[in-house]
Amino acid sequence: MTVSADFTPLLHKAALGRPLDSHEAETAFHAIMAGEVDPVQLAAFLTALKLRGETFAELTGAVQAVRHHMTVLPDVPAGAIDVCGTGGDGLKTLNVSTAVAFVLAGLGVPVAKHGNRALSSASGATDVLEVLGIPPTDDLELQGRRLREDGLVFLAAPQHHPAMRHAAPVRKALGFRTLFNLLGPLCNPAQVRHQLIGVFDGRWCEPVARALGALGSLSVWVVHGSTEEGGSDELTLAGPSQVSAWQDETLFSFRIEPDMAGLAAAPISAIRGGDAQTNAAALLALLDGAGGAYRDTVLLNAAAALHVAGRGDIVKAGVIDVPAFRRNVGMAADSIDRGLARAALEAARMSAHSIAPKDAGRS
């Protein structure tokens, strides 16, 4: 291993409890992504940041470094959106953002969904998509074709962030959330400028929205839901959700209640998930018209995503426009009830098998 000479003084600074500026954080994470940091040093660095509390500048610098090392998907349609969460909330729910992606695609919104295998849930996006017959691929040409022709592509994190492997063993050994848990949603390989992102801790809503705005995003919602079992990285029916939004170069925050969308409250246990097969079956049932809390949770998040994508403005001067919000819920419901979302899934499945992915068997 070639050890970075630039990293050690930054480790010392972090160990003293002093914050790094964005340039220093970018330098540190460049070294990490290049595999030039000793595992013991990396563990000490991440722990020091965690204990002191990571800052906005450190987040921004880390994002710039990770984006520099990622494999970018070129020629992405204007207006493409990502809907994803950080994971790490420990609630083990059904796959909400994956279902939202099909709902949006059914309405003609181009979706470049960034995802991974299960972290805190029983089944991550990649796990359930494989069961649905939509395996990941590292073929950029095929990914681009899926997005251009189907309006939907799923981008598995390992295929686009190979440099993350240098940090993976240390992150696993540490066993607690670090700054890395936030970086995936902020580093979409399609470089989308519209995003609905869920975070595991509400304190990150505003910094993440502000960071994405500073890095060129046009429209962003960063959300954190409340439940009877703790916070959620999605908008929930179980309680109020915190939102920080970046739009028109302005940052503002507000709360959303389920009844604003015309939806009934429900406990988080109503959307408890299982393994990949269980979650895939629930998603198919949802797209085939099944009702209940899972459908309503998907509608709530899809309505927000439609706003972020510019398909139905539901915020006026930083305040939720309730009738407009409910119209967006209606649009999302229409995608399901008219079979548009299910058709989007079938198109994605057909595209996945029109050319056999090079890495379909990779775990």
From Swiss-Prot:
Q: What SUPFAM superfamilies does the entry give?
A: Nucleoside phosphorylase/phosphoribosyltransferase catalytic domain (SSF52418), Nucleoside phosphorylase/phosphoribosyltransferase N-terminal domain (SSF47648)
Keyword hit for Aminoacyl-tRNA synthetase:
no
Question: Hey, which pathway is this one from?
Answer: Amino-acid biosynthesis; L-tryptophan biosynthesis; L-tryptophan from chorismate: step 2/5
Against Gene3D superfamilies, the record matches this protein to: Nucleoside phosphorylase/phosphoribosyltransferase catalytic domain, Transferase, Pyrimidine Nucleoside Phosphorylase, Chain C
Record-listed anthranilate 2 binding positions: 171
Q: Which residues bind anthranilate 1?
A: 85, 116
| Residues reported to bind Mg(2+) 2 | 233-234
Cofactor binding: number and manner: Binds 2 magnesium ions per monomer.
Give the UniProt entry's GO cellular component terms.
Answer: cytosol
Where Mg(2+) 1 binds, per the record, is at 97, 234
Q: Which family does it belong to?
A: Belongs to the anthranilate phosphoribosyltransferase family.
The molecule here is called: Anthranilate phosphoribosyltransferase
Q: Which organism is it from?
A: Gluconobacter oxydans (strain 621H) (Gluconobacter suboxydans)
Name the gene behind this protein: trpD
